[in-house]
Amino acid sequence: MVECDYDPTEDATPAEVVEILGRTGMAGEVTQVKVRILEGPDKGRIITRNVKGPVREGDILLLRETEREARPIE
């Protein structure tokens, strides 16, 4: 077995889900949420992101980047 020193959470920024906006995707498999960035230069900023899988208010997500926002659901 090959060992790897890569840690996917190393570059991640924690963000707390503050509001669930709705479902999107062809079959509603993606949830659009507002998150508050908890660390880093964007700390305190609230952005909209799409999340795949179960999510609820208060959950902490680890974001690889905090620059990009999701387009609003129409």
Swiss-Prot record:
Keywords: Ribonucleoprotein, Ribosomal protein. The keyword tRNA processing does not apply. GO terms for cellular component: cytosolic small ribosomal subunit. NCBIfam families: PRK04007.1. Belongs to the eukaryotic ribosomal protein eS28 family. Pfam families: Ribosomal_S28e. This is Small ribosomal subunit protein eS28. One of its GO terms (molecular function) is structural constituent of ribosome. One of its GO terms (biological process) is ribosomal small subunit assembly.
